[in-house]
Amino acid sequence: MIKTRTISMEVNKMVGETFDSIIGLFPKLIPDATMNSDGWWSFIGPYGKSRVKFNQNKSLGILDHEYIDEESSWNIPMRIIPNGDFSEVIIILKKPEQLTDFQFDQRVEKISKLATSMKKILESDI
C-alpha cells in the first residue's frame, strides 16, 4: 500500500494571486537556488544537493513539482483551487521508496511547518 499525506491550507488571496505568489516565493525561501536552462532549480537543502522543477498550468491551478535530493526523489502534486474570496492549496505527499516510514513522517512534519511559514508569507503582502 502506498503511504500518502495531504497538506491543505486556506490562503487569503484569489487563485491567480496565490499561484503567482508561490512561484515568486521559491527563490526567496531558498536564496542560494539557481535556475538551470532545463527549468530545474538547484540548491543545497537539508538533505544535501537538491533540485526542484515545477510543472505548472496556471489556468487549471496545477503547480506540481519534482523534488530530488541525495536521499530521495518525490513527485508532488499541488493544486490551488478557488474557495470563495480565498484559495485552497492542496499538497499530496507520497512516500518515496527510498525512505522508511519514520523518515517519511519526519519529512512530512518539516514540510507541514514549511507550508505554515509559506502561508504566513503569502498572506503578509496582501
Language-model segments: what does each one mean?
Residues 4-6, 47-51, 72-77:
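Short, surface-exposed coil-to-beta transition loops
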Residues 18-22, 54, 89, 118:
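Hydrophobic pocket/interface hotspot
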Residues 40-46, 63-69, 93:
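Short beta-strand segments that buttress and anchor functional surface loops
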Residues 66-126:
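Beta-strand/loop substructures that line and gate deep hydrophobic ligand-binding cavities in soluble
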